[in-house]
Amino acid sequence: MPISSPGTRCSSDLKDPTLQQYSAESVSTEQSLGTFEESKGSITENYVQDSSVDEHDDGNWQPMEVISLEPTHLINDIDDDNEIIEEKKETEKVEESELEPRYTRVFRDEDDDQKHQLDSEAIKLLDIADHGNEEISMDSQLEITGNILSETEKMAYAGVCRLLILKMVDKIACFTTLPWYRGECKAALEDTIMWADKTTSCIYEHLGVTVEEQKMIENLHKHSVQIDDLSKILVSAHRAQTVSSLDAVLVDEVESSDSLSSLGKEKPVQIDVRWTVLCDLFLVLISKSLYDCRSRSLLMAVGEVLDINEFDVAKFEKHIVETIQIDDTGELEAGSSANTEAVMKLRRKVSRRKKYILMGLAGIGGGLVIGLSSGLLAPIISAGIGAAFTTVGLSGVATSGFLAGGGSAALITAGGAISGAHIGTTGMAHRKADVKTFEFRPLHAQRRANVIVTVSGWMLSKEDDVRLSFATLDPIVGDIYSVFWEPEMLASAGQTMNILATEVVTQSLQQVLGSTVLVSLMGALQWPLILTKLGYLIDNPWNNSLDRAKATGQLLADMLCYRSLGVRPVTLVGYSLGARVIYYCLRELEKKKEFSIIENVYLFGTPVIFKRTSWLKAASVVSGRFVNGYKKNDWILGYLFRATSGGIGRVAGLRQIDCIPGIENIDVTNLVSGHLAYRESMPILLAAVGFEVLDEEVDLVSEPIPEPLRERQSQLLYEIEAEECQNKQKELIEKSLMQKGRSLSPKKSNAFFDSKKIREELKKVKKKYGSSFNSRWY
C-alpha cells in the first residue's frame, strides 16, 4: 500500500526570521517493536507433595494448597456482559512446613491477557515506590525517578525533549514557507510556540538545569547534534536501585526464599532508564496541567526515539493513571465540563440568523427560476392543458380564449413564481435545519488519559448501533466514544448514494404518465422541470446530508471546546459522511483557535472538495498524525458528490492530498471494494494505519441486506410509485372537473385509475432495464 511522504521539515528557511530560533533539523528515527513480556502481576508457584504423584505420571491432578500474605483476596472477574463481579475467596490455612512461601498480586481489567501486560522493566520502576500499596503518590514517584537518573542522563533527557519540541514547532512553521501561504497558520504557530516555551521551562525546572546548561541545550541543533546521539545514552543505560525483596519478587523473578522472614531483605534491582524517562516526563506534564494533544504527541515521540512503540507507551500510560494518585483525574471523565443540551442550544442560536438569510435567498432564486421558465413556456403549457381537457370531454374549456390569451401566460408565470419561492424556501429550511440528535455513546470508558472519538458515515436503520464498525478496537488505545448523530439522516444516506437508480425511476415514471390521458401536459411540463432542477439541487437528500454533516462537525467542535469528554487529548476517526463531520470540526476548532485538543485524525472516503487553504487550516489543528484514506475508483462517491457540487474542485476521498506537508495519504483501493464497504472494512483499515485491533473480521458488523429482501423492497417501490402516480392524476382531473361542477362516478373513477395497469407498466420498465436496473439501484 503506497503511503506518501508527509513532507519535508524546514529548518531555517522560514519567511519569519523570528521563527528561526525554534527550527530544528529533521530527525529520522527507526521504530522498533517492543517485546511483550508477561507482567509480574500474579506470581504463583505450584507445589505438590513428593510422594503423592509420580514424576512421569500426568494422568491425575492433585489438590494444590496455597499460602497468602493476606487472609482474603478480592479477585475481580469479568462476566459475558463486561460487568465486573467481585468475588471474595477464602484462603485455606496450611502449615508453613509443608509449603514454600509465595506472594500473589492480582491485576485488573485486561491485564490477565499477556498482550496487555505491562513490560517487566516498567513494572520494576513502579514497584520501587509501591511496597505493596494499592496506589502511589505522584510526588513520591517523581522523587524516585529523579534519584535514579544521573546528571548525564538528565542532560540527555532534557536535550531529547527540547529537540523534539523544536521539531513539533518546525512542523507548523514549515507551512509558512509554502509559495501560496497567506498567513493561514499564524495563530497556530504562535500558540505552539507558547506551548513549547512553557513545556521546556517546566522540564528544565524539574530536572534542575542551570542557565548555562539551558543555553547549551538550546544550541544543540546549531552544532549538528542529532536526537539519536542523545537517545543512545538513555537506551543503553541501566541503573541499580535497592528495593525490598518483596518487590524484587514481583519485578525480577528472583528465586524463592526459604521462609517468610526472608521477605524483609534488601537487594538491588536493575532499572531501565528508558521507562524512567517516560514515567518522569508523563508525571511532569500531568502535574503541571500541560497534558494536551501536543504533550501526548511529545510523549509518543520520546518513546519512539527510545525504541518503545506506541502500544507499550499506551499500556504504561494506563498503568500510571490506575496506580498513581493524580489530583486532577476528574478531568478525565466525560461530561465534566459541559451539558450537551446547553451546547446544542447555543449552536442553534448562532446558526439561526444565517439560516433565515439563506432561506430568503433560496425563495427569491426559486421564484425567479421557475417563474421565468414557466413564463417562457406558457403557450406550450396552455396548449397542453387544453389538449388534456379535450381528452376528458371538456372541449369548451380547451377552446376558450383564456388559454390562448395573455391572461393564461400571466397566471402560469405567477403560479410558477409562487410555487418556486415555496419550493426554494422549504427546501433550504430542510437543508439548513439544526442538528436535533447528538450524543456520545461509549464503547470503552475507563478514565484513560486520552480519548478516541469515532463518527460513522451512515446507518442501516435508525436502530442501528454506530459503534459496530469500531467494536474491534483494542481498549488499550484509550477511551472510545462513538458519535450518534441524526439517525434519520444516516439511515437515508445509503439510499441517497443510489441516486443513479433514482434518476432511472424518474424516467420510468415519465414513461408511465406518457401512456395516460395527460400526454400533452407532461410533454409541456418536462422541459421547465429539466431546466430548473431546483427541488433536486436544494432538497436532494445527499445535499441535505452534506449540510447536516457540516453542522454536526461544528457542534462536535463546540463539545470538544467545552471539554464534554474531559480535559485530555482527542483522536478523531471517521468514514464517508463521518469524515466530513470531522473535517468541519477541525475547521471550526481553527476558527476558535483551539490547538490543544486534537492529537490524531484518520479520514476515509471523505466527501469534501479539496481546497488547499482550507485543508491547511484543518491540518494546523492536529498535533500528531493526519491520515487521508482514499479509493481511486470509488465511483459512487465521485458521481454523487461531483454531480451535486457542479463538478467544481476535487474530492478528497478519491485522491491524495500532496501539497500540504504533514498529511499522510493511504491508498485503500485494494482494501475496500466500494464506498458502501467502508462500514464493514473499518477493522482492516484501522489495522492498516497502525491501530491495535482485537480482530480484523467483521463478525460484529451487521451483514448487508439479503437479496430476497432487496427484491421485496424493489417490488414495494414499484407499488408506492404507482400509487403516487394514480393519486396525482386523480387529484388533477377531479380539480378540473370541480371547476365545471362535474365529477366522475366512483365506478368510472375506479376503472379509469387502475393501479394494476400502472404497476404492469412499471414492471415493463424493470424488464427493459434488466439486471443493470437492479445493480444501479443497489
From Swiss-Prot:
GO terms, biological process: clathrin-coated vesicle cargo loading
Localization of this protein: Golgi apparatus membrane
Protein's membrane topology: Multi-pass membrane protein
Composition bias type Polar residues, residue spans: 1-11, 18-34, 41-51
Segments passing through the bilayer: 356-381, 401-423
This protein's record includes keyword Calcium: no
Family: Belongs to the TMCO4 family.
GO annotations of cellular component type: cytoplasm; Golgi apparatus; Golgi membrane
Annotated segments matching region Disordered: 1-60
Chief site of localization: Golgi
Descriptive protein name: Uncharacterized membrane protein C6F6.13c
GO MF annotation: an example: AP-1 adaptor complex binding
One Pfam family it belongs to: DUF726
Domain of life: Eukaryota
Alphabetized UniProt keyword annotations: Golgi apparatus, Membrane, Transmembrane, Transmembrane helix
Organism for this UniProt entry: Schizosaccharomyces pombe (strain 972 / ATCC 24843)
